[in-house]
Amino acid sequence: KDVSIWNINSFAEFFMQIYNKYQAQYEKACQQFIDERNRFALRLKEIHFLRVLPTQANYFCCEVKPPYTAAELTKQLLARFDIMIKDCNSKTSLKGLNYIRISIRNQVDNDYFVAALLSLQNQ
């Protein structure tokens, strides 16, 4: 029996109706993302001027340590490598602290990002 679910919106209701059809693909995609997040976290730990905070999200929050500041690292990555990251200094709770936010993307993009950081580290 089809029963309308009144406590969620129509988009969520539609998703619930088709979830079983795509459940295996969804679970596979989630696992692929988790695997890439774990791999990327290990790669980021190669960077001496970053302290990577644990996450369950689709991004990392990292403390930037000398010789860089969050603002300087953000500027260098954009100017030299066309990579834009979030300097979290504008966040009220992180004001005055050197934190950045890094999106987790695909393996190729993530490796390019790490290579850029390694280049900055080795200069």
Indicate where each model-derived feature is located.
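Alpha-helical elements of Rossmann-like donor-binding domains used by nucleotide-donor carbohydrate transfer enzymes
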Residues: F14-F15, Q32, R39, E72, ...
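PLP-dependent aminotransferase class I/II
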Residues: K1-E46, L50-L53
